[in-house]
Amino acid sequence: MKRWFKYVKPYLPYFIIGPLCMIVEVLGEVIMPKFLAGIIDNGVQNRDIGQIVFMTAMMIVTALLMMAGGVGGSYFGAKASVNFAADLRRDVYRKVQDFSFANIDRFSTGSLVTRLTNDVTQMQNFINMLLRMALRAPGMLIGGLIMAILLRPSLALILLVMLPLLLICMTICIRKGFPLFNKMQEKIDALNSNVRESVTNVRVIKSFVREDFEKKKFGRSNANLKQAGMNAMKLMIFLQPIMMFFMYTTTLLVVWFGGNTVIAGNMQLGDLTAFITYITQILISLMMVSMLFVMSSRAMASSRRISEVLDEKIDLNDDNAAHTDLQVKEGRVEFRHVDFRYYKNSEDKVLDDITFTIEPGQTVGIIGSTGCGKSTLVSMIPRLYDVDAGEVLIDGVNVKDYSLYHLREGVGMVLQKNVLFAGSIKENLLWGDENATDEMIRNAASHAQADGFIQSFNNGYDYDLGQGGTNVSGGQKQRLCIARALLKRPKILILDDSTSAVDTATEARIREAFRTELKDSTKIIIAQRISSVMEADEIIVMNEGRITGIGHHDELLKNNKEYQEIYYSQMDKKEATA
């Protein structure tokens, strides 16, 4: 509760005023039957028009006050719940933004989206309902019960028999509800993950003619969610008829015994009418409570899932950084006996005893078979992952001693998977330097061999890339990402297979731009093609998570078996022997 009070406190007036407004509505509901009884007993039976008009006027005034209270309660309840949800959603989003890659790996993307949207909405709806019903339902129950007892204690005994039976049924339903709603949220996770994956990769699906497979896959996820939803909704389907059964049974018993009492002359007809109204109010208030508890079961499941995100321990932080103001100045990179596993309990190392040094301004290529750990290795430099053993140093300082902000400001990465965001080309390039001028942007794009195709678009640099950059080709995406990195002008630039979708001539011009524009920056190039790294100052050869060779192209071609295999598999034999 302490956690959630943090989100209640800023809007405490709304949380207080809303229920107080509902009290006005409850008082009106309790008083109304007495006015109705007065109209019947004192007005209709005595044929007193004045009494009827007076009581009717009182009922109208009371109804207006009830309406004002109801509107006020709904308004302040909505204000409180919407603000609560907005602040909670903001904090969950900020927490996710602080996640390391390892943290994100523990949650699926679809699950995080569900928790940010659906789960927060469930809590918002529950709070809105709670503020409207928390005082109204108990107020109607207690007020109706008191008035019923005051009117006719003997008839009120009927409630003492029916209420315990009703409460037992409600308790059973609520206890069964929590695991069912929790299961339902998990199925929503699975469905969201399925939808996100299929929509994101729709081009691949169409190119492999897998639409039918994906439709069936979605159908299974949708059917699972439907079944989970039906299982949860069975509570409502079961609970509502029970409530109605008890309501009608209680009303019939009251009408039977009360009618006999009226016929015997021991009770007035107006009082019986008021008593029946109070009984109805009591049972309706119990229905409200049951609805509230059913919603609370779903909200509790959602709150647990949100708490899992908020309680997730961030694997990477700079709380223990020794030099929080230190910035990357030279770009010297050193690995000392680094080991790494993606899963701490795994026996297989992704990186095994990695040791090397890159001097400032050097261009170093990293090459090796697919899955040998190249991308994982460079992820250690900006601390996207932390090492299990050994240490990574930049300018002689352990990366853990830098603040994450200053460390990552000094490192630029063009990832293997090129990522662009919805918006214009200019907006995407400004990620590299938000203060860059138009001239700087165009210069970076020109060196990345992107200015030509950008100018061919109708709006040039204001051309809308679409969601995820879907309006440009793979090669154009790569060049835009390179331009973004050039604009950042980092001390360490990491290129993770970033020119795989461009031709060799364009790649050569991009490499030349790196040499001239970033001559003082350390450049690390991961590549599948030897032509991409053969002119590097040094080349690191990797195989199965280990370094098998470090040296120049000619040196490795003579002495390193893995490098020879890659080279001869890519080069024409005549060219290789020339």
What is each of the regions a protein language model found here?
Residues 326-578:
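ABC-type nucleotide-binding domain
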Residues 46-47, 82, 90-114, 118-120, ...:
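Short intracellular "coupling" helices and adjacent cytoplasmic loop segments at the cytosolic face
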Residues 20-21, 28-41, 62-109, 113, ...:
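Juxtamembrane helix-loop junctions of ABC transporter transmembrane domains
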Residues 10, 98-102, 118-127, 131, ...:
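An intracellular "coupling" helix at the cytosolic face of ABC transporter transmembrane type-1 domains
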Residues 2-5, 13-34, 55, 59, ...:
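Alpha-helical segments in transporter systems
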Residues 9-72, 76, 149-154, 265-269, ...:
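Transmembrane helix-loop-helix hairpins at lipid-water interfaces of multipass membrane proteins
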Residues 47-54, 147-161, 231-305, 309-310:
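Helix-loop-helix
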